[in-house]
Amino acid sequence: MKKTIFAICAALLALSCTQAEAPKQQPLENSVVYEMNVRQYTPAGTFAAAQEELPRLAEMGVDIVWLMPIYPIGVEGRKGTLGSYYAVKNYCEINPEFGTLEDFDNFVAEAHRLGLRVIVDWVANHTSPDAVWVTGRPADWYERDAEGNTTFTADWSDTANLNYENKDVWAGMAGAMR
């Protein structure tokens, strides 16, 4: 009898030790992506206010929330009074008008709890003219014209083009993404 009980317990234990399958996520090509401009999404324009809207997005069938750039915006050469999200001043900080890093982390945690994925728009081609990389890096981090002036894309006077021929720029980008 003891051997039978032991065998049953051993079998149950062995069966209960198998790993549960991870929940299957919908293939990306079938996903509903919602682009969110945090500044304009709610009257408050913050992560905390946007977080309150995540259940509604999940109910609408959204799978992925794509946040427009969330980094501080440069001031030099600024277009308009608010500036362009794509004129990144510092890749390693959160735009304070949206809240804190903790507010962002809470937003992402709530999105994940609701089964939503979050994508953060990464601005890889350029920074603002007054970005920490412009003032704190060698001049060869940026594309230069024949006179040695930083180049800009089209009429985007608030975005200085990065020089990807410099491998340090590649390393800097990889480091900022961590």
Language-model features: locations:
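C-terminal motif of bacterial Sec signal peptides marking the signal peptidase cleavage site
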Residues: 15-16
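Positively charged n-region of N-terminal signal peptides that target proteins for export
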Residues: 1-4
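Substrate-binding/active-site clefts of carbohydrate-active enzymes
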Residues: 22-48, 52-63, 69-178
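Sec-dependent N-terminal signal peptides
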Residues: 6-10
